Amino acid sequence: MPTVAYQGHAGAFSDVAARALVPGAETRGYGSFDAAAAALDAGEADYAVLPVENAIAGPVPRNYELLWEHPALRIRGETTLPIELCLIGTAGASEATIREIRSHPVALEQVRRYAEAHDWQQTTTTDTAGAVREIVTQGYPTVAAIGPALAADIHGGTILARGIQDEAENYTRFFLIARTDEAGAGNRACVGIAVNDRPGSLRDALSAFADRDIDLRFLIARPDRRVPFRYRFFVELANVDDARLAAALAVIGGEQRILGRY
C-alpha cells in the first residue's frame, strides 16, 4: 500500500486531496509543509501532496520553493478540490451556543462575512482538521471549528452548518509529488528559472516559451536567499513536449530546473 505525506491532521483538505490522487493509499499527516516534503525525500513516504494555489487566497509560495530545495522531488500530477467549509462543533452544540471559532487563518478569512454576522471570537490554528480535533477533544459547547466534513467524520465532530464559505466558487489546487530522477511525461510542466540580471531578461525568458507555442499558465517570483534582491521564477506551462521545452530552456539559459511533467 503506498503512503502519502501531507501537512495537517487527518481529515484536512490536503488529506482529502491525497485520497483523491492516490486512491487506497495510507495518508500520513505532518506538522508543516517542510516536514511533509522532507519525509518524502527521506523515503518515509511514497508521495507527498502539497497545496499550491487557492482561488480566493492565491498561491502558496513556500511549496514551490520546497520543490527547488529538494532536487530529488518531482511533480507527478495535480488535482483541483472544491473547498466546502463547515461549522463543526461538539454533540449538543448549535450555532446559537457558539461564542468562538477556531481554524487555519486562510479558512477564517474565507468565512469572514459569515463569522462577522455572528460576532464570534476567532482563534487561529495550524490547520483546519487540527482545529476540529482540538474542539472535539476539549468538548466545549461554545467553541466550534471551521473545516472539512471529512475531519468531522474522522474526529467525531458534529456538523452545525455546511457551505459557510463567503465565495461559493472556492477551489484549491494540489500537486502530487514523488521522489524520482525522471522529469516525467505529460503536456504540462513546472520549471524554476533564475534569469540573468539585465533589462528584459524576464521578457526574453517568457518569449522563449511563447515563440514555441508553449502556454504560460502561472508565474510566481520568489527571492533567491543566496543573492540579495535576486529572484527565482516558478513557471507553470501547458501544451508542452520534450523538444520544444528543451529548446526554450536552452534559449533562456542560466540556473534552471524542470520540477515536473504531468
Language model segments and positions:
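Domain-level signature for soluble enzymes in the chorismate/prephenate branch of the shikimate pathway
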Residues: 1-262
